[in-house]
Amino acid sequence: MSFEALRYDVEDNILTITLNRPEKLNAFNYQMQNDLIKAFDEADKDDNVKAVIVTGEGRGFCAGADLSSGKDTFNPSFDTFGVKEDDFRRDAGGILTLRMFKFLKPIIFACNGPAVGVGASMQLAGDIRIASEDARFGFVFANRGIVPDACSSWFLPKIVGISKALELTFSGRIIESHEALDISLISSLHKPENLMNDAIN
């Protein structure tokens, strides 16, 4: 399969999905959402895929929503989203995380760099989250005056506890990878050059 916003590589029964918009720090847009959903649909049907690793190309995992289109950022056309305007649902990250939650095989997120907004919240639907020492995480929705997206108000308290989830979302602060490990947002921390090999192992 070919995708515009990601790479899809299967080797030794492991599918590696690489978010591939490095010029924008892999910022999330509707093309990426559609590509990710199609990738998980394809992997669910492929008996050769036993597990999935999701990572980012370049120095970032995902910089959050791509806001470069201004007011049209969340106003997709039929051609780019595949639905009529009347059928449009606003939380693109939520549609993605619910698809991942229904996925039949293990999903490992290997966070290689900064992950903010939907870049952080999409990882909550994974089964395992590991990160490089270069990773940072931010549930920054309060900074924009919006509620947390991608079902993170359900996932995050189950992972880090209600008090820490509230503190992270109320403050909107960015946390370093060592703090993410301390609060069990990730399960292990790795040298950047070892991240993918460790994820595979």
Which stretches of residues belong to each language-model region?
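Conserved CoA-thioester-binding segment of acyl-CoA-metabolizing enzymes
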Residues: 1-57, 73
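Hydrophobic/aromatic residues within transmembrane alpha-helices
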Residues: 17, 54, 66, 122-124, ...
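Histidine-centered beta-alpha loop that forms part of the nucleotide-sugar donor binding/catalytic region
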Residues: 20, 65, 112
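Charged catalytic carboxylate motif
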Residues: 31, 35, 92, 99, ...
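Glycine- (often His-adjacent) and acidic-residue-rich active-site loop
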Residues: 56-99, 115, 145
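Crotonase-fold acyl-CoA enzyme core
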Residues: 98-201
